Amino acid sequence: MESTLGSDLARLVRVWRALIDHRLKPLELTQTHWVTLHNINRLPPEQSQIQLAKAIGIEQPSLVRTLDQLEEKGLITRHTCANDRRAKRIKLTEQSSPIIEQVDGVICSTRKEILGGISPDEIELLSGLIDKLERNIIQLQSK
């Protein structure tokens, strides 16, 4: 019998993301916005778009649309790097701080609800298995 593990994991990611999007809708943000803001917030100040894209694990053109949306909402600013006029530096605005706090609260409470009824040992086991799968895939990609 063929394993459906890959499909099962993909479906889990889809429904998890859909729930996050639903919960963030009152803030007029999406899971993609949160991931971007979260990474900008945790990285050293004024990262370039290239550095941010690498940290998130996406291509730079995919990131630009999200950054445009966050800039329109007044949550980030972008300015040209003094050393490299082609590069843009990203900075959170003062307005973003309370929003990031709200979003983090939504994400944290949603995560707790999703993981409800699952023991810490089970979560640790699952995380370990996911790490193993990721390492196997990375190793296969490098061949």
From Swiss-Prot:
Record Pfam families: MarR (PF01047)
The entry's keywords: Activator, DNA-binding, Repressor, Transcription, Transcription regulation, Virulence
Alphabetized SMART domains for the sequence: HTH_MARR
**DNA-binding region location:** 49-72
Please give the PROSITE patterns that the UniProt record associates with this protein: HTH_MARR_1 (PS01117), HTH_MARR_2 (PS50995)
The residues the entry assigns to the signal sequence are: none
Every copy of the HTH marR-type domain together lies at 2-135
Superkingdom classification of source: Bacteria
Gene3D superfamilies referenced in this protein's UniProt entry, alphabetically: Winged helix-like DNA-binding domain superfamily/Winged helix DNA-binding domain
Q: Which InterPro entries match?
A: HTH_MarR-typ (IPR000835), MarR/SlyA-like (IPR039422), Tscrpt_reg_MarR-type_CS (IPR023187), Tscrpt_reg_SlyA (IPR023071), WH-like_DNA-bd_sf (IPR036388), WH_DNA-bd_sf (IPR036390)
GO BP annotations, alphabetical order: response to stress
* GO terms of molecular function: DNA binding; DNA-binding transcription factor activity
Family membership: Belongs to the SlyA family.
Q: What exactly does this protein do?
A: Transcription regulator that can specifically activate or repress expression of target genes. Required for expression of the virulence gene inv. Important for the regulation of genes that influence the early stages of infection that occur in the Peyer plaque.
Q: Which PANTHER family match?
A: TRANSCRIPTIONAL REGULATOR SLYA, TRANSCRIPTIONAL REGULATOR, MARR FAMILY
Q: How does it assemble?
A: Homodimer.
The name on file for this protein is Transcriptional regulator SlyA
Q: Which organism is it from?
A: Yersinia enterocolitica
Question: What gene does this protein come from?
Answer: slyA
